[in-house]
Amino acid sequence: MTLSVSVIIPSFNRASVLPRALNSVLAQTHGAAEIIVVDDGSSDGTNALVERDYPRVQLLTQCNRGVSSARNAGVSLSTGEWLAFLDSDDEWLPEKLNPK
């Protein structure tokens, strides 16, 4: 069974830890259909980091409206059949997206 999963990562001033989160998604044994980072008004270079180091990742930038707004913005942009949310300071084990 193939699942189309959109991964949504809200982020606010987390450029120092965001790579760990993104790398854990990219290392999934069952890859995500899309990865969306919603930058919630960061001033620490989050946008530049994602654009430079993660060209496969969709980046959505908004004014700081909080994590719930960032998640909702990611949902609006997503195209997957399933949604998976990851906080920008967290990471997944490689089997997280495997259908069970």
Feature map (PLM): residue ranges:
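Nucleotide-sugar donor-binding/catalytic module of glycosyltransferases
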Residues: M1-K100
